[in-house]
Amino acid sequence: MVQRLSLMATIADDDFPLFKTSINILTGSPAVVYANLMVVWKPNPNYEVDNLNSKNELVEPTRMTTATSIPLELILNDPVSKNNGVDSDEILNTMKEQEFPIKQEQLFDMINNPSNNTINWTLTTADIPAAGSNRKVSMQAIQEATIVHQAGNNPTLANVMAELGYSFDYMYVTVGVRFVHKRDVIIHCHKVWDIAEDNIIQVTKGGYVVHTFVTVNRATDIERLNLAEANLLSLQRDLSGYLDFKVPDRKSMDSRTNLTQKDITL
């Protein structure tokens, strides 16, 4: 389990070129383009699960997230780009207003088709961020594992998650750029698309989400946690007046789920 300290901000579409140039100068690192498919799973309401752990403590059911990268040539619909590289301005400017270039059937196929059983997935569970009105950064405990291969009679990600007692909840795609700053500070700037079976909606139309974070390997490493917080606050000060970094709403980052009667009857 690691601790992730983070801050978030937003920028408008028209501000992206200046943002990219400014962060490139500040960090001294180039923008790395990425596209990720994020699939969120909820506890299967058909199963009766004991919510008490071995210490007789109440454990609330939580969602799990699986993530994998999407080949950028699929985003651009250009197989040549795989060898020639992808320009971040080209891919993000192209996707500001146009429809998402990948059909939702292709994305659902990645989790339901046995022929995709060699796709690597990162499985993540997360606690609700630490409470406290005086917190200057968000702090969240995260656990990650890697699914490198799905086996069995029906080797799909959906079947693997079903065997773990989870069913599909929703999925989304993030496409953006990543910068690596000093002292392990990572900066992501991306757009988000909500993927449903009947349509794809750009949630961030007109702008981008900016997420900066530091990951600390041990929750007991107080010195490292304090240093990570100081580095994030330093970046916040450096970009004040241009980016308004804030602590994200902890409730929006809560992976716990309360199963209602409506959920059970679906």
UniProtKB/Swiss-Prot annotation:
Keyword Ribonucleoprotein found: no
Functional note: Component of the Mediator complex, a coactivator involved in the regulated transcription of nearly all RNA polymerase II-dependent genes. Mediator functions as a bridge to convey information from gene-specific regulatory proteins to the basal RNA polymerase II transcription machinery. Mediator is recruited to promoters by direct interactions with regulatory proteins and serves as a scaffold for the assembly of a functional preinitiation complex with RNA polymerase II and the general transcription factors.
Protein name: Mediator of RNA polymerase II transcription subunit 18
Major place of residence: nucleus
Cellular component GO terms held in the UniProt record: core mediator complex; mediator complex
Naturally occurring in which organism (per UniProt): Candida glabrata (strain ATCC 2001 / BCRC 20586 / JCM 3761 / NBRC 0622 / NRRL Y-65 / CBS 138) (Yeast)
Gene: SRB5
Keyword Transcription annotated: yes
Assembly: Component of the Mediator complex.
An MF annotation (GO) of this entry: transcription coactivator activity
Similarity field: Belongs to the Mediator complex subunit 18 family.
Location of the protein in the cell: Nucleus
BP-aspect Gene Ontology terms: cellular response to heat; positive regulation of transcription elongation by RNA polymerase II; positive regulation of transcription initiation by RNA polymerase II; RNA polymerase II preinitiation complex assembly; termination of RNA polymerase II transcription; transcription open complex formation at RNA polymerase II promoter
A Pfam family it matches: Med18
Top-level taxon: Eukaryota
InterPro entries (alphabetical): Mediator_Med18
Keywords: Activator, Nucleus, Transcription, Transcription regulation
